């Protein structure tokens, strides 16, 4: 499972011209599910999202987690995180999980994170317009199976 985590002042998702989800200060996380991912990957990603210390404390140091800062989470599925462009010019998505299983694990991750923080979501397998105001900017790449 792969995530692009962005600290933000606000973020929102629009589907078919209608705002479907919006958060204030917190994180926008783009989440890709890989073939072979399991609930263990969901647990790992959720734990990192909730507890990663990328929010400033009273001294201006990145010392607080999403949970500690009272921030919100916008979790958006994005299979293109597994796009492979090493060969040719058009990305291949052979590593991305099939839609039914990917949606199941995406929803499981949403459910897990919702136990700790307010979570907004995009609509799975739709064309979305995602906007945010980066804070920092702070952007972290996270993979449940490897380091970048």
What are these regions (language model features)?
Residues 88-96:
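Short hinge/gating elements
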Residues 1-88, 100, 104-148:
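N-terminal, polar/charged subdomain of small-to-medium soluble alpha/beta proteins
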